[in-house]
A protein has these predicted regions:
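Short beta-strand segments
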Residues: 72-74, 133-135, 162-166, 185-187, ...
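Acidic-glycine-rich active-site phosphate/pyrophosphate-binding loop
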Residues: 80-95, 159, 174-185
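Acidic/histidine-rich catalytic neighborhood of metal-dependent amide-processing enzymes
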Residues: 108-181, 386
């Protein structure tokens, strides 16, 4: 194995050893990255969250001028609980050309490769900078990147492009769906099941809301807006979990349902939310004819992430196409922090090593060949940043 790839694997192995599940601190990993960069004379900015248990990191390599390219990834991972791993998920295992471990493909492989390339970045006669931006909480709320993005807007000269290194097998992804999640809570009136006339069943009303959500999902499937870059080529809506009642012989006082929209770029979530709010408002009035205690409320749940919209003549797409030779746009159904970067004014694409098919599952891995190919991409990017 080449020395440069061994260096990459050594760093990825160190990163995997940090348990950065989203509900835990990522500070040990961030401090490791900060210290590694400091060994090369690079001073990184560490941005802590309000609680002080998590942080993002921003570092610049090259001159402090406009035209920089940001390489960005999240440091947190999904949990391993409930998964049947063949080996310790936090001890990287190299086997048959694959590196196994939690986060190996999503996204510690990308982060480790960027860090391993730092000596190459420093040796290059960069005329425009490369920026490293590493966030937290992408796998939970996808909000940990926002303070980092705001800091970039405040401190960096004009950035030419942001490349999010989510696993795309090296393809340039110019579009992804947004994700918006809500929970709807229904409050009725309990009563003995022998006298349903004295109560208001929260579960019955929740069922009617679910039926309206299904109608909405079917309308999204058939409406004129189509997304040829996506599979399926329309916005999707589903109900994920339902809870309600506490005993068979009691008219249910409470019910709760969680539902999620995956919207095409250009399909606003506001229209779906307004339709549901209008429907539930009418249901609530009907319930309150029986009792003023009744209520229905819909609240934002775990996530709300903007879609990534293809940019006509976008700087990020133009650059990434030139570096990869790709000619046709592609989109993905999963969402990423790219939506937030674009929402805040940065030209953004998604392009990273490894396959999303290996993410979030037991025995997660990244192919070494994917890392080698992406290293060539970073070499071409570095050369580009050295040109006039």
């Amino acid at each position: 194995m080449r020395l440069d790839m061994q260096r990459t694997l050594d760093i990825i192995t160190r990163l995997i050893a940090f348990d950065t599940t989203s509900d835990r601190s990522n500070l040990a990993l961030i401090h490791f990255v900060r210290d590694l960069l400091a060994e090369h004379g690079i001073q990184a900015s560490v941005l802590s969250n309000a609680e002080g248990d998590k942080a993002s990191l921003l570092a610049t390599i090259g001159p402090a001028v406009a035209g920089g390219v940001v390489l960005s990834g999240h440091t947190d991972t999904v949990p391993v609980s409930g998964q049947n791993w063949s080996h310790d998920p936090y001890q990287a295992t190299l086997k048959e050309g694959r590196l196994y471990g939690r986060g190996s493909v999503d996204m510690k492989g990308f982060i480790g490769l960027c860090l391993a390339m730092v000596p190459d970045f420093l040796d290059a006669p960069l005329k425009r900078p490369l920026h490293l931006a590493f966030s937290y909480d992408e796998e939970s709320t996808c909000l940990g990147c926002l303070p980092l993005i705001d800091h970039m807007r405040d401190t960096l000269p004009d950035v030419a492009a942001v490349i999010i290194g989510e696993p795309t097998e090296g393809r340039v992804v110019s579009a992804h769906k947004g994700v918006h999640a809500w929970r709807t809570e229904v409050t009725g009136v309990p009563a003995h099941s022998s006298r349903p006339d004295l109560g208001v069943s929260a579960t019955f009303y929740a069922a009617r809301i679910i039926s309206e959500l299904e109608r909405t999902a079917n309308d999204l499937r058939t409406q004129a807006s189509r997304g040829e870059l996506f599979e399926p080529p329309y916005s999707t809506l589903h109900v994920s979990t339902i809870q309600g009642g506490n005993a068979t012989n009691i008219i249910a006082k409470d019910a709760r349902l969680h539902w999620e929209l995956r919207n095409l770029p250009g399909d606003t979530p506001d229209a779906v939310r307004a339709r549901v709010d209008d429907f539930t408002a009418r249901l609530a009035l009907e319930m309150q004819e029986h009792s003023p205690e009744c209520a229905i409320q819909t609240l934002e749940d775990y996530a709300s992430v903007p879609a990534l919209t293809p940019e006509p003549d976008g700087k990020a797409e133009t650059l990434a196409f030139a570096l990869t030779g790709q000619r046709e746009r592609c989109g993905v159904g999963f969402c990423s922090e790219a939506g937030w970067f674009q929402d805040r004014g940065f030209s953004t694409v998604v392009c990273g090593p490894g396959s999303i098919a290996q993410a979030h599952k037991a025995d997660e891995y990244i192919d070494i060949a994917e890392l080698e190919r992406y290293r060539e991409f970073l070499i071409r990017l570095t050369r580009h940043q050295c040109t006039d």
